[in-house]
Each structure stands twice: as structure tokens, then as C-alpha cells.
């Protein structure tokens, strides 16, 4: 009788340890995916809001390299006007991510709210106040890489 009780307790403990191990593994995977989404969205926002007219071609390519889906298609069509406008206006903007957090996750897609500060340099003006924006960035994971698939400025 004691042997049967010992076996039952042993099986229950093994089941509990297995379940706890699985839950820890699942939590680790969710944290890894959350970090991947937040990092990709933050980098995508910084890429989008950092432009130097002297390197506008490289800046536009950097945006495309971190994009996928409809955002990639849309920016690809507007890439040349983005470059031309940056050069014409002699834009020098530096976007810095001040905070970011995952709003929702659905499979291989996540939506991240990103707060950014954008500072501009204009030699004609002595002092320029930074601009503060919030951007909702949708990120799509393909394989081990996550890229920006949509960007919406939040009022």
C-alpha cells in the first residue's frame, strides 16, 4: 500500500514538475517574442524619424530594410519623393525612442506603442524645440526577424 501511495505521489510530482517546466518555457518564449516586437518597432520608428539630407538615400534604404508588407509597398512607392523632399528642405532630424510597449500580440504579429522625441537641426534657426510624438507600429515576424508592417501616428 505504501509503495502504491509512493508511486502515485511520484507520478503527481513528475506531472507537476513537467507542467511547471512547460509553463516556464512558454513564458520565456512569450517574453522573447515581446522583446523582439518592441525592439523591431523601436528601431523602425527611429529609422523612420531620423533623416539627414546628406544621406537621404541610405536613410530611405534603412527604412525599407526594416519594413515588410503594406508599409514596405507604400514606402517603396514614395521612396524617391522622400529622398527629394529631404534634400530640397535640407532636413536633419534625429528621432529618439523614449519609451515603447507591446499593446497586443496575435501569433506572429504585434502592435507596439512607441513614444519618440524628434530634434531637428536648422542652421538658420538658433533654437528649435523638440517634437514629441506617439506612433503605433505593427510588426510582423517572419522566421527569426521582425519588421515593420504598418505605422500610424497617434494624436
Please identify what each model-predicted range represents:
Residues 88-122:
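Surface-exposed, charged secondary-structure patches
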Residues 111, 132-155:
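Short beta-strand edge/turn micro-motifs at domain boundaries
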Residues 79, 114-118, 152-153:
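A mature extracytoplasmic/lumenal domain signature
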Residues 32-92:
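Core segments of small alpha/beta cavity-forming domains
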Residues 47, 120-125:
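A short, acidic/glycine-rich surface segment
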Residues 1-26:
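Amphipathic, hydrophobic N-terminal targeting peptides for secretion and organelle import
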Residues 21-37:
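Ser/Thr/Pro/Gly-rich low-complexity linker/stalk segments immediately outside membranes or between
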Residues 123-129, 149:
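Solvent-exposed, non-transmembrane alpha-helical starts
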Amino acid at each position: 500500500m505504501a509503495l502504491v501511495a509512493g508511486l502515485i505521489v511520484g507520478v503527481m510530482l513528475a506531472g507537476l514538475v513537467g507542467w511547471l517546466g512547460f509553463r516556464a518555457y512558454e513564458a520565456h518564449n512569450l517574453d522573447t517574442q515581446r522583446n523582439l516586437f518592441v525592439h523591431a518597432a523601436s528601431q523602425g520608428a527611429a529609422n523612420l524619424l531620423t533623416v539627414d539630407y546628406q544621406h537621404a538615400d541610405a536613410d530611405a534604404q534603412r527604412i525599407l530594410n526594416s519594413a515588410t508588407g503594406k508599409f514596405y509597398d507604400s514606402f517603396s512607392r514614395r521612396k524617391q519623393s522622400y529622398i527629394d523632399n529631404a534634400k530640397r528642405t535640407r532636413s536633419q532630424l534625429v528621432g529618439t525612442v523614449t519609451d515603447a510597449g507591446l499593446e497586443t500580440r496575435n501569433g506572429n504579429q504585434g502592435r507596439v506603442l512607441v513614444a519618440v522625441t524628434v530634434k531637428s537641426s536648422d542652421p538658420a534657426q538658433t533654437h528649435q524645440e523638440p517634437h514629441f510624438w506617439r506612433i503605433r507600429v505593427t510588426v510582423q515576424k517572419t522566421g527569426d526577424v521582425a519588421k515593420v508592417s504598418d505605422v500610424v501616428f497617434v494624436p
